[in-house]
Amino acid sequence: MKMKKYVSHRFLQLIPILLGITFLSFAMMRLAGSDVVTEMYQNRGTEVSQEIIDAKRAELGLDQPFLIQYGRWLGGMLTGDMGESYMTGKPVFPTFLSKLPATLLLTALSIILTILVSIPFGILAAVTHDKIPDLILRFFSFIGNALPNFFVAMLLMQLLSIRLQLLPVISDGVTLKSAWMPALTLAVSMSAKYMRQVRAAVLEEWNKDYVQGAWARGVRSRVILWKNVMKSSMLTIITLLALSIGNLLGGTAIIESIFMWDGVGKLAVDAITMRDYPVIQAYVVWMAIIYVLVNLITDLLYHRLDPRIRLGVTKG
């Protein structure tokens, strides 16, 4: 099977997955049992008659059978029309797009910080196995894994914002300076987890027969590490990065709320609180697309890096 055929086949597989996710999420929200129109007016602090509520429900199509509602929404989504927010009355798609720059900036900065910390220290812990550097790094990795993100956020606020006054506590807009605090908070836990995984992957490769054979032939340790061990360990690192990128692009609701970072995660939390179904549905679609694409890209990277997988594709 050629690579183009493989990619086309994977894309075709994604269509029923996305349709299934949108259908289930749409059904679950409709089965919640609450009257969206009544809550919408209550949240706005407006008292209206039952006639107005019924008219609004008909305007939004909420008086139609479930399948008709889903079909109308799906048809609109395919043309870029995700409806209007029940709470603000603004189009959902532009509102969602306006939050993406903040989420993309936070994702990129968090991933960069995580890579810069976890990979070098993970390698150092592996090559100094059971020695003092390894023990120290494993201790800090354990602490980083144990601390919840909101607690790390409070510690960083106290240290970097209140005492040292280096960074702002609350975001004053989508700027690089405001992104440092939430990005550092996310990077602490991710770096701790990644460092352990990188260490384990490097140690596993380091103890394999081909590495021992290279040692016996007099190949230098540095060459073995970077040319052989790290190349084989990249699959583990790519898997971890793919999962984290998916989570980060979906927004990190707690961290965004703590630092008032105006990203996708905060938008989703506000929508869930207000039962703003069109915005919630847009968020579900976004998350589904992100995870599907991230998994596809990860598979393609696997084929690129692992000759055994690539061989299986070409012969399939």
Regions found by a protein language model. Give the residues of each.
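Membrane-water interface segments at transmembrane-helix boundaries in multipass membrane proteins
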Residues: 138-200
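Hydrophobic alpha-helical segments of integral membrane proteins
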Residues: 3, 11, 52, 56, ...
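Transmembrane helix irregularities
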Residues: 32, 144-147, 249
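An internal, D/E-rich "acidic patch" concept
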Residues: 62-119
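Cytoplasmic-entry segments and transmembrane alpha-helices of multi-pass inner-membrane transporters
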Residues: 2-11, 120-156, 235
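Residue-level signal for discrete positions within transmembrane alpha-helices
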Residues: 14, 99, 103, 139-142, ...
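Hydrophobic alpha-helical transmembrane segments of membrane transport/permease proteins
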Residues: 18-71, 165-181
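Alpha-helical transmembrane segments of integral membrane proteins
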Residues: 4, 96, 100-133, 174-316
